[in-house]
Amino acid sequence: MGKIIGIDLGTTNSCVSVMEGQEAVVIPNAEGKRTTPSIIAFVEGGEIKVGDPAKRQAVTNPTKTVASIKRFMGHSFSETTDEAKRVPYSVVKGDNNTPRVDIDGRLYTAQELSAMTLQKMKKTAEDYLGQTVTEAVITVPAYFNDAQRQATKEAGEIAGLKVMRIINEPTAAALAYGLDKKGIDQKIAVYDLGGGTFDISILELGDGVFEVLSTNGDTHLGGDDFDQTIIDWLADEFKAEEGIDLRLDPMSLQRIKEAAEKAKIELSSSAETEINLPYVTATASGPKHLVKKLTRAKFEQLSDTLVKRSMEPVAKALKDAGLTVKDIDEVILVGGSTRMPRIADEVEKFFGKKASKGVNPDEVVAIGAAIQGGVLSGDVKDVLLLDVTPLSLGIETMGGVMTILIESNTTIPTKKSQIFSTAADSQPTVELHVLQGARAMAVDNKTIGRFNLDGIPPAPRGVPQIEVAFDIDANGIIKVSATDKGTGKSHDIRIEASSGLTSEEIERMKKDAEANAGADKIARERVEKINEADSLIFQTETQLKELGDKITDEHKTAIEYALTELRMAHQSQDLEAIQKGLDNVNAAWKTATEAMYAQGEQGQAAQPQAETQGDDVQDVEFEEVK
């Protein structure tokens, strides 16, 4: 059995880990970094860049550089209109009311784009392990609904991965934190503020059992929102001074987005930072520059409502777990955004204790996912993970009410059924409107599926008995069935299409992803070949100068002729001509060096002979004849 890797698919950054013996190891990417920006760029020539290479060119290519795509995962287009206004790339309405990113007329789903990041993680792991990777545990925010979980699973499939388990991020963090503390019974709170989402989970740890008692969160609260407060402040200040809204120009927007993120990070360790963006825009009167000082106090004032917003789910999760702050033994901060001093201060103030510093907030989730992979493969023993469903599940009943079958924070996997009946006399069909959420009315909750149970025999209202059953697996993915108890006729659906993609679309995207991987390989090989030519041209020019008169004029002419051909091929970037040029230069060098060494050997052979003749000369006495 191959290795099951653990992937933290983040809004801002992603991370991959794998079990090596009894230790989870975070794997550095090709750029040598332990986390990879969740950024995808489409550049000229059809090449797709992922991670740091994509991030580096974002300012000059803002409309074709996609970041924070996780915020669109599993949502309908109508749910993401506000998000779409905040990004420099174009988000349009696609099939099944799904949001799609428009890149030169080609519409990409959030799943396809996330799959590109997952492919990068997969390749990173394969390069490290020296073997093909096909299985993964992927993390999601605890408060992700069914559609968002399905979308994540689909992204994994498109990337060529069999998703062995979808695991909640705070649970993964707790697993990483508590693996070496199996003998200690304790209750922990995991406060997870990432780039785009926020979760709070309360867990009980003991004897290798990790039991989630409750979870809560906000899937629209993260580091991006803190950045946005700085973006809006900068843009509003500049507009007041210059009368220009920088948010309307994609390139200017990208520049202030990057500056805002940098300022936020700097303010975690400094009391003040300067934002300096020369030539941020231009008017008829000339270029305009943006120079502003931002203090930590001002930033905390700008983001105050966001910090307070994060504490509401914390209080609710604690209440749902039936605990008070005094019952919590450890507080763990997860996610890069928890490095903001105000966050740590607020959390520590709420719980009345210092947060644990024993975990790396950027890596702990991926490590936990790798440990879960180890549990599934049998490499990690004596660990049991008991997670919960984050949102209540039910169906719409008379009057547009949501009738709950499975309450939020129920341990999964689980199954629950309830008997319902018809609302009208001789009703032949029952439509089941499956919902997920926490509101009383159906209209206020998330629709995750609809299906009909047909063929109900004519009967007065309230007589037929329809058993509705909900089944949630360990991934938090739902199956719903309805059975007419009188006839035994039943119908069930696995809520597969709640993300808006059909199985055919997923298969097509999977093939596209494989084709892209092939195209990326060709593009990489092309660059490598051009670089090889560039290197050989430089080496040849250097060696011709160094060797000088040691090479005959005839051989020097042959090398220079081949070198000229290679230079022309390098300029044209014709790979076939480059390969021919490389072969010709190498062949000319081979002939020249063979002749050079042969000449050297002849010289060495003549030298011993002369030395031998000298050794045979002896001194003799002679008499001068007069």
From Swiss-Prot:
Annotated InterPro entries: ATPase_NBD, Chaperone_DnaK, Heat_shock_70_CS, HSP70_C_sf, HSP70_peptide-bd_sf, Hsp_70_fam
Low complexity bias: start-end ranges: 598-612
Top-level division of the source organism's lineage: Bacteria
Keyword set, alphabetical order: ATP-binding, Chaperone, Nucleotide-binding, Phosphoprotein, Stress response
Region of interest called Disordered, as start-end residue ranges on this chain: 598-626
Keyword Phosphoprotein recorded: yes
Keyword match Transmembrane: no
GO terms for MF: ATP binding; ATP-dependent protein folding chaperone; unfolded protein binding
Induction entry: By stress conditions e.g. heat shock.
Family, per entry: Belongs to the heat shock protein 70 family.
Protein function: Acts as a chaperone.
Protein name: Chaperone protein DnaK
Organism expressing this protein natively: Flavobacterium psychrophilum (strain ATCC 49511 / DSM 21280 / CIP 103535 / JIP02/86)
